[in-house]
Curated annotation (Swiss-Prot):
InterPro entries: Alkaline_phosphatase_core_sf, IDS, Sulfatase_N. GO terms for cellular component: cytoplasm; plasma membrane. Ca(2+) binds at D42, D43, C81, D321, H322. This is Ulvan-active sulfatase. A lipid is attached at C18 (S-diacylglycerol cysteine). It comes from Formosa agariphila (strain DSM 15362 / KCTC 12365 / LMG 23005 / KMM 3901 / M-2Alg 35-1). A lipid is attached at C18 (N-palmitoyl cysteine). Keywords: Calcium, Cell membrane, Hydrolase, Lipoprotein, Membrane, Metal-binding, Palmitate, Signal.
Amino acid sequence: MKRLFIYTLGLVLTVSACKEKQQKTTVTQEQKPMNVLFIAVDDLRPELNFYGASHIKSPNLDKLASQSLVFNRSYCNVPVCGASRASLLTGTRPTRHRFFDYKARADTDAPEAVSLPMTFKQNGYTTISNGKIYHNIDDDSLAWNTIWFPKGNIRNYQLEKNILKNADANLAMGGASAFENADVNDEAYFDGEIARKGIADLQHLKKSKQPFFLAMGFMKPHLPFNAPKKYWDLYDREQIKLPETYVQPESTPKKAFPNYGELRNYGNIPKKGDLPEDLAKELIHGYYACVSYVDAQIGLVLDALEKTGLADNTIVVLWGDHGWNLGDHKLWCKHVNFETALSAPLVVKVPGKTNGERSNAITEFIDIYPTLCELTGLEVPDTAEGVSFLPLINGEKQIKNWAVSKFKDGVTLVKDDLFYTEWTDDDGVAYERMLFDHKTDSLELDNLAEKPEFQELVKQLALELRQKWGKDFLTQNTK
């Protein structure tokens, strides 16, 4: 995927100005406010050991999950990184004309919104952005006291053959590989550096009298699948299998199956057609290696949180910005309206409240914003559109049983076990439909949308989708 890191990598921005929408309130450690460690993991799908994928080696995430509330049905609002992050961090829904793709910016698409880090900053928190939080490093820059990103080529290759081929730092078109197995230490790749920066921040923040909102944006398992050799060695290629859903049913609209251009851009990937089985398995192997690599880096930060004595007063939120296809429906990457792209990991640890519980309640990423505000006693801005899931953390039932996600023309309503998608034009008129019942078809292989016996249900879901996608969904943003 193309990157828009238009500022020099490694840029450190220290800013003190803030939006004048709200009066700043000072909070000090004397009042014992809760800190927040906010961990974003790029392209992490919920194929993890604590989600039941026993073949994945993720001991540090497993430990965090055992101390947290684990959300089994958490959905991103947009399955592409820039838009998903901008939506989550502003707490606002995507519309027909907002949060469209990876280039989306919070400060451009939702300039009226008070972002999550800005809310914490305005209430006296030290706010730090490390690594990839927003897609664009300078997005919403006034919300942070410090913005840091590691220096170097964004593809971060270590093998000379890949470095030479990757002539353009921002384009996979340089011809380099979609994966790399290099015998290097963890700090050779960006996530090792990001972890070290987070550890240093925690050691410094321990001495501060101010509470903190520390955001850690880890880069893997995003393409290219580059990880130190020892993490590749955790998995036996011979034991890796293609997904059960390695098929594209004819009943499903062709619109649902894009050509996954993000992966096709790499030099060792065919430009069209199905991938050869051995290449598909090598990609899956690389993804798994990256998951284990980033797990180890996150573990270092969580260990530092404990060692500094901050863990008992720090909320930890870990989320993947969307799902990812590893050959599911013969698809790769995100950018689609299937469960595999819309469902993403969400784990929330609240000291004294969570201890390995699990929830099957449906949540959306925009629900994270109001929840963190309520947990820390901050007022939720009027611009935030999500619903707090604090009742779930408190052991209560959640009334909400739906989520809405969107990618370009495709808009999906998840309601209980039903998974309904429409592709619409600018007037909101559907031109393709897709309906799955996860109770009987969790693999999404039998599209019910065009079957006569389901037409009444389709009408009901179409109406409900329009009620829930937001009143401004079709409005052109003229700002």
